[in-house]
Amino acid sequence: MKFQVLLCALAFSVTACAQTTSGTHAASQGEFAPTQVPPLPAKLEFAGEAVPLGNYDTRESLTREMLTTLYMHSRTMQTLLAWKRYFAIIEPILKKYGVPDDFKYLCMAESGLNPEARSGAGAAGLWQLMPAYAKSAGLLVGGEVDERYHVEKSTEAACRYLVDAKRRLGSWTLAAASFNAGVAGVSRRLEKQGVTSYYDLFLPSETMRYVFRVLSFKLLVGDPGAYGYRIGTEDYYKPLPEYKEVTVDSPTIDWTAFARGHGTNYKLMRELNPWIRDYDHNNKAGRSYVVKIPADDSRK
């Protein structure tokens, strides 16, 4: 009797599993969009320098990063939604320093255009600047004030780095690679391997992928719809609110009180000034800070 009951139970279990599996398989058909290999253009440049798409390894590397970028859907979509907001700030600064416009895509690859981005290695801000370089570039780096999060100042620091890297390495593409691996790291490998092009250079895995990741954003921003990203004009993040600038140099600064005293709140002030990292600042050095305040805060 027990054996018969066991057989019946086993038969029921197998039948149920078969029905579940069959049902799941049937339901899955037609529910998922096809996963496609992204098309590559016939020609491509970065910063006015040709990308050798005729080389099989170059094409495969670009395809790999296109796949990675395209199929990280939520992160990539958020990055795309933010580009109009931040490119309007970044582009004039690149032009001022003579840095090619394509470097705005490097900023996308670095931080996803999130001014609050911070890496496990300690890099921070839109350009993911490390503390040592930021300090050498004249930025303040601390727990209360950290100018790596200052959109304009960090962009200027990045530009100064890139101009110097281009002068030392000879090409903008190598300068871009050095933003990840350092000028010394790239220069040493160029000498060891006897090559002059980024695309012929064997580098640590992250740096070998780095420029291709930047290129993936260039292609995607150029035509999001071609890669399956449907974004209406009204979907893009609006520019940050118009602001007025207020200078403060008090020995101690209560940022919440400062914001209220200028007709806004701490949250909105922080969004315009992400370099402010705490509620208070002990300004013993007597530095002057230019703070952006919403020109017309309708919520106050």
Predicted segments with their positions:
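Hydrophobic h-region of N-terminal signal peptides that target proteins for export
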Residues: 10-18
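Substrate-binding/active-site groove segments that recognize
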Residues: 121-142, 155-158, 162, 186-189
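Catalytic and binding regions of secreted/periplasmic enzymes and modules that target cell-wall glycans
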Residues: 162-189
